[in-house]
């Protein structure tokens, strides 16, 4: 959610 590129 906080790191869109990581899928978070």
UniProtKB/Swiss-Prot annotation:
GO molecular function ontology, one term from the record: peptidase inhibitor activity
Keyword annotations: Metalloenzyme inhibitor, Metalloprotease inhibitor, Protease inhibitor
The protein's role, per its UniProt record: Inhibits angiotensin-converting enzyme.
The name this protein goes by in its record: Angiotensin-converting enzyme inhibitor
Lineage, opening ranks: Eukaryota, Metazoa, Chordata, Craniata, Vertebrata
